[in-house]
């Protein structure tokens, strides 16, 4: 059994290892620790420092690493596990992997719907910040004698952010305080203390008209409106289009997120506006939405992002071309083959290889991986 190729995946912490051997049982397995009953090559891989789990299906492995581990260190060890190290280990003159590449996951800790702490997780660190004391005090007031605080607290996913983690924390804190103003806390406490609401997170979903939104002068109110907006429809596009011109980055970013929920090619021109936003966080979010929608019609716009000054944006463009591209994108890919970011360069190489080999994109397989039982 040999490695045919190694490909990146939508997750910076997962690599796909394509093998020369295809499983005949058509089953899949997830391995997380070395055990005698497992295949020897699986145990060898799990013994590599930094590897946390392996998903094996058909003719490939999905290898997960710790966020703090570097692929540039791990990949040669993976290759060496399959064949003689002297033959497999290659002289790699790639730039060092930037540990701040990719997403910063933002989460909000709540108790009965009352927020009181923010957590950010990047590739190499975790940062937490408590909300102002008023929020902690109100959270305490919402407790009853029968509450199990550890069991009842919940982490709310605020989505991904991009950039310097300290600057991201400042931005997320500003967003949270705008979304949950102090004036709203008594309402949250009242709801938390009501019978049958002990474990429920309270959400204020409210639809507003374009005129009502346009009349809002305070950006915090505009952001709160978008954060509490129900799933948008085509009728909401004018409002969201207006939000794309907002002076505040969080408002523009949330408008992009909402536009991405309208699963239609008709919203592509609005997402293209996001691709040209002055904020790299908005550009990357727009690229993520386009990637999730998967419309090949967006290829010309995504190709332009290969020249973006931010590698997090270039990586998303290369990943989309890997998933949806064809021979028309080869000249652009080859023109950017020497990208100075390791992850971007690797993704461009894989896109070129897939297109030239005539291989199909494996979106259905990524869904299988995402839904696998771990």
Swiss-Prot record:
Q: Which Pfam families match?
A: HEAT_2, Nfu_N, Virulence_fact
Q: Which SMART domains does the UniProt record give? A: EZ_HEAT (SM00567), Nfu_N (SM00932)
Q: What one GO molecular function would you report for this record?
A: oxidoreductase activity
What cystine linkages occur within this chain? none
InterPro entries, from UniProt?
ARM-like, ARM-type_fold, Nfu/NifU_N, Nfu/NifU_N_sf, PBS_lyase_HEAT, Virulence_F_dom
User: What family is this?
Assistant: Belongs to the CvfC family.
Q: Which PANTHER family does UniProt cross-reference here?
A: CONSERVED VIRULENCE FACTOR C, PBS LYASE HEAT-LIKE PROTEIN
Chain's role: Required for hemolysin production.
The name of this protein is Conserved virulence factor C
Question: Which organism is this protein's natural source?
Answer: Staphylococcus aureus (strain bovine RF122 / ET3-1)
Name the gene that codes for it.
cvfC
């Amino acid at each position: 059994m040999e490695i045919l190729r190694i490909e990146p995946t939508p997750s910076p912490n997962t690599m796909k290892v394509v093998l020369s051997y295809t499983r005949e049982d058509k089953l899949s397995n997830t391995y997380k620790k070395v055990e005698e009953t497992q295949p020897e090559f699986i145990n060898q891989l799990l013994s590599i420092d930094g590897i946390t789990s392996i998903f094996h299906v058909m003719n490939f492995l999905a290898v997960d690493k710790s966020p703090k581990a570097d692929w540039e260190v791990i990949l040669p060890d993976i290759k060496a596990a399959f064949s003689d190290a002297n033959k497999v280990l290659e002289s790699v003159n790639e730039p060092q992997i930037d540990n701040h590449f990719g997403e910063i996951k933002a989460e909000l800790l709540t108790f009965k719907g009352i927020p009181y702490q923010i957590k950010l997780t990047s590739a190499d660190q975790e940062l937490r910040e408590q909300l102002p004391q008023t929020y902690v005090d109100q959270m305490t007031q919402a407790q009853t004698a029968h509450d199990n605080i550890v069991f009842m607290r919940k982490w709310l996913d605020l989505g991904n952010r991009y950039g310097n983690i300290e600057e991201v924390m400042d931005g997320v804190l500003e967003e949270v305080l705008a979304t949950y103003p102090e004036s709203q806390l008594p309402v949250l406490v009242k709801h938390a203390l009501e019978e049958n609401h002990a474990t429920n997170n309270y959400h204020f979903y409210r639809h507003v008209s374009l005129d009502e939104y346009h009349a809002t002068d305070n950006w915090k109110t505009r952001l709160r409106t978008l954060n509490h907006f129900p799933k948008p429809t085509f009728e909401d596009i004018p409002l969201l289009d207006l939000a794309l011109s907002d002076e505040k980055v969080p408002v523009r970013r949330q408008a992009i997120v909402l536009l991405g929920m309208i699963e239609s090619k008709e919203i592509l021109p609005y997402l293209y506006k996001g691709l040209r936003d002055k904020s790299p966080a908005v550009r990357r979010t727009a690229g993520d939405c386009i990637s999730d929608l998967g419309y090949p019609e967006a290829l010309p716009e995504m190709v332009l992002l290969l020249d973006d000054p931010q590698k997090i944006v270039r990586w998303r463009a290369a990943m989309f071309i890997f998933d949806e591209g064809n021979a028309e994108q080869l000249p652009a890919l080859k023109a950017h083959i020497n990208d100075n970011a390791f992850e971007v360069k690797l993704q461009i190489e894989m896109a070129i290889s897939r297109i030239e080999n005539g291989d199909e994109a494996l979106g259905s397989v990524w869904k299988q991986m995402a839904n696998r039982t771990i």
